[in-house]
Amino acid sequence: MLSNWIHRGASALLLLALAAAPATALAQLDIPAWSTLLLEAVSDGYVDYSRWADNPRFDALTEQVAQTDTGAMNREQKLVFYINAYNILAARGILDGGSPEGLIGRHVYFKRDKYDVAGERISLHELEHERIRPLKEPRIHFAIVCASASCPILRSEAYTLERLEQQLDSAAGDFINDSDRNSFDVEQRKAALSSIFKWFEEDFVEAAGSLQAYLAQFVEDEKAVDLLERHAFEVDYLRYDWSLNGKR
């Protein structure tokens, strides 16, 4: 009888452990600590990377990115982890002397340099294209930040599970309505868009049927929305500025 009670108790504990696994896995990355570091170093998207240099708190985050187990995570938990991981490691690359400027610099920064992510040794390019994009969330293109001036701004807060939808919507709206990155001339019916919309057009088309339909969900100007919904804009793409989004 005692052995049966012990067996049932052990089974119950195992079930509780399995149920808690996703939350535990996500908790391996100290998101509040990342938010604190962002608040200390980021102002209106401008990053003072020197605040994270030789910083044991930042180094601890890169270790956590390496050790986190994503096996039990659901889609939303993976989005939170991978978005934060990308932004942490993009900064790590800058601190290690990397740069997205120049063709060679971009190749080294995005493809050659490797990082430990959830038990794998991968590049920023692989992290984006093989781990994040397969989650089918086009708003990630406004959340992951490649340390360049034309990238979306790095926000002064980490992405969290509780606020993920709100944060992604905010990131998309802020980026699309930023006149330095996208402009909509309703009189001439011409749109000058970030090259992000050219490079990843298939992601936006898959989500909304067309690029202009996707943009219409976030654009604030009502006249521009009307034209976008009628696919009436002639679209061109802006030159991408790969200069650093802050200082080392």
For each feature predicted by the language model, list its residue ranges:
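Bacterial N-terminal signal peptides that target proteins for export
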Residues: 2-12
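N-terminal compositionally biased, intrinsically disordered segments and leader/signal-like regions
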Residues: 12-13, 25
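N-terminal signal peptide c-region/cleavage motif recognized by signal peptidases
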Residues: 20-22
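Interaction/scaffold regions that mediate signaling and macromolecular assembly across diverse proteins
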Residues: 26-72, 76-248
